[in-house]
Curated annotation (Swiss-Prot):
Database matches in NCBIfam families: rplN_bact (TIGR01067)
Keyword RNA-binding listed: yes
BP terms from Gene Ontology: translation
Organism of origin: Phocaeicola vulgatus (strain ATCC 8482 / DSM 1447 / JCM 5826 / CCUG 4940 / NBRC 14291 / NCTC 11154) (Bacteroides vulgatus)
Keyword rRNA-binding: yes
GO cellular component: cytosolic large ribosomal subunit
Main function: Binds to 23S rRNA. Forms part of two intersubunit bridges in the 70S ribosome.
Complex formation: Part of the 50S ribosomal subunit. Forms a cluster with proteins L3 and L19. In the 70S ribosome, L14 and L19 interact and together make contacts with the 16S rRNA in bridges B5 and B8.
Similarity annotation: Belongs to the universal ribosomal protein uL14 family.
HAMAP family listed in its UniProt record: Ribosomal_uL14
Protein name: Large ribosomal subunit protein uL14
UniProt xrefs under InterPro entries: Ribosomal_uL14, Ribosomal_uL14_bac-type, Ribosomal_uL14_CS, Ribosomal_uL14_sf
Amino acid sequence: MIQVESRLTVCDNSGAKEALCIRVLGGTKRRYASVGDVIVVSIKSVIPSSDVKKGAVSKALIVRTKKEIRRADGSYIRFDDNACVLLNNAGEIRGSRIFGPVARELRAANMKVVSLAPEVL
Protein backbone atom coordinates (compact mmCIF):
# COMPACT_ATOMS: atom_id res chain seq x y z
CA MET A 1 0.00 0.00 0.00
CA ILE A 2 1.88 3.02 -1.33
CA GLN A 3 0.62 6.56 -0.86
CA VAL A 4 1.97 10.06 -1.45
CA GLU A 5 5.29 10.66 0.42
CA SER A 6 6.08 6.91 0.58
CA ARG A 7 9.74 6.12 -0.11
CA LEU A 8 10.54 3.16 -2.34
CA THR A 9 13.67 1.26 -3.30
CA VAL A 10 14.39 1.31 -7.03
CA CYS A 11 15.21 -2.30 -7.96
CA ASP A 12 16.50 -1.91 -11.52
CA ASN A 13 19.82 -0.80 -12.99
CA SER A 14 18.63 2.61 -14.20
CA GLY A 15 20.96 4.34 -11.70
CA ALA A 16 18.42 5.47 -9.11
CA LYS A 17 18.54 4.01 -5.59
CA GLU A 18 15.58 5.59 -3.81
CA ALA A 19 12.38 7.29 -4.99
CA LEU A 20 9.57 9.26 -3.32
CA CYS A 21 5.96 8.81 -4.44
CA ILE A 22 4.46 12.16 -5.41
CA ARG A 23 1.26 10.95 -7.13
CA VAL A 24 -0.84 7.80 -7.39
CA LEU A 25 -2.21 7.53 -10.92
CA GLY A 26 -5.73 6.35 -11.71
CA GLY A 27 -8.40 8.82 -10.67
CA THR A 28 -8.65 12.09 -8.78
CA LYS A 29 -9.42 10.65 -5.34
CA ARG A 30 -7.18 7.57 -5.52
CA ARG A 31 -5.01 7.36 -2.40
CA TYR A 32 -3.24 4.00 -2.40
CA ALA A 33 -1.27 1.98 -4.93
CA SER A 34 -0.34 -1.70 -4.75
CA VAL A 35 1.68 -4.17 -6.83
CA GLY A 36 1.20 -3.58 -10.56
CA ASP A 37 0.12 0.05 -10.24
CA VAL A 38 1.88 3.00 -11.87
CA ILE A 39 2.84 6.01 -9.75
CA VAL A 40 4.76 9.25 -10.28
CA VAL A 41 8.01 9.45 -8.32
CA SER A 42 10.77 11.93 -7.59
CA ILE A 43 14.28 10.46 -7.54
CA LYS A 44 15.87 11.02 -4.10
CA SER A 45 19.24 9.27 -4.38
CA VAL A 46 21.29 8.02 -7.34
CA ILE A 47 24.56 6.21 -7.95
CA PRO A 48 27.37 8.36 -9.39
CA SER A 49 27.55 8.84 -13.17
CA SER A 50 24.03 7.57 -13.86
CA ASP A 51 21.61 8.71 -16.55
CA VAL A 52 18.97 9.46 -13.92
CA LYS A 53 19.50 12.68 -11.99
CA LYS A 54 18.52 13.43 -8.40
CA GLY A 55 15.25 15.37 -8.26
CA ALA A 56 14.07 14.08 -11.65
CA VAL A 57 10.38 13.18 -11.95
CA SER A 58 9.51 9.85 -13.53
CA LYS A 59 6.79 7.21 -13.66
CA ALA A 60 7.37 3.93 -11.82
CA LEU A 61 5.75 0.50 -11.63
CA ILE A 62 5.42 -1.03 -8.15
CA VAL A 63 6.84 -4.57 -7.99
CA ARG A 64 6.99 -5.27 -4.20
CA THR A 65 5.10 -3.99 -1.15
CA LYS A 66 5.33 -4.63 2.58
CA LYS A 67 1.53 -4.72 2.76
CA GLU A 68 0.31 -8.22 1.98
CA ILE A 69 -1.54 -9.01 -1.26
CA ARG A 70 -4.48 -11.43 -1.18
CA ARG A 71 -4.58 -13.97 -3.97
CA ALA A 72 -7.58 -15.71 -5.51
CA ASP A 73 -6.79 -18.99 -3.71
CA GLY A 74 -6.95 -17.24 -0.32
CA SER A 75 -3.20 -17.10 0.31
CA TYR A 76 -1.29 -13.91 1.04
CA ILE A 77 2.14 -12.73 -0.04
CA ARG A 78 4.21 -9.86 1.29
CA PHE A 79 7.78 -8.65 0.83
CA ASP A 80 10.45 -7.09 3.04
CA ASP A 81 10.48 -3.73 1.25
CA ASN A 82 8.54 -1.41 -1.02
CA ALA A 83 10.20 -1.47 -4.45
CA CYS A 84 9.58 -0.11 -7.94
CA VAL A 85 11.11 -0.02 -11.41
CA LEU A 86 11.37 3.23 -13.36
CA LEU A 87 9.46 3.64 -16.62
CA ASN A 88 10.15 5.91 -19.58
CA ASN A 89 7.56 8.10 -21.31
CA ALA A 90 6.42 5.18 -23.48
CA GLY A 91 5.74 3.07 -20.39
CA GLU A 92 8.67 0.69 -20.92
CA ILE A 93 11.20 -0.26 -18.26
CA ARG A 94 14.20 2.08 -18.17
CA GLY A 95 16.74 -0.46 -16.92
CA SER A 96 17.79 -3.76 -18.44
CA ARG A 97 17.97 -5.76 -15.18
CA ILE A 98 15.72 -6.19 -12.14
CA PHE A 99 17.05 -7.09 -8.70
CA GLY A 100 15.11 -9.23 -6.24
CA PRO A 101 11.86 -11.17 -6.55
CA VAL A 102 8.62 -9.77 -7.98
CA ALA A 103 4.99 -10.76 -7.45
CA ARG A 104 3.14 -13.06 -9.87
CA GLU A 105 0.39 -10.42 -10.12
CA LEU A 106 2.65 -8.45 -12.49
CA ARG A 107 2.08 -11.01 -15.25
CA ALA A 108 -1.15 -9.33 -16.27
CA ALA A 109 0.22 -5.80 -15.92
CA ASN A 110 3.66 -5.94 -17.52
CA MET A 111 5.16 -9.08 -19.08
CA LYS A 112 8.68 -7.66 -19.53
CA VAL A 113 9.10 -7.17 -15.77
CA VAL A 114 8.37 -10.85 -15.18
CA SER A 115 10.84 -11.99 -17.85
CA LEU A 116 13.65 -9.78 -16.46
CA ALA A 117 13.11 -10.72 -12.80
CA PRO A 118 15.35 -13.40 -11.27
CA GLU A 119 12.43 -14.86 -9.26
CA VAL A 120 8.65 -14.63 -9.51
CA LEU A 121 6.71 -15.41 -6.33
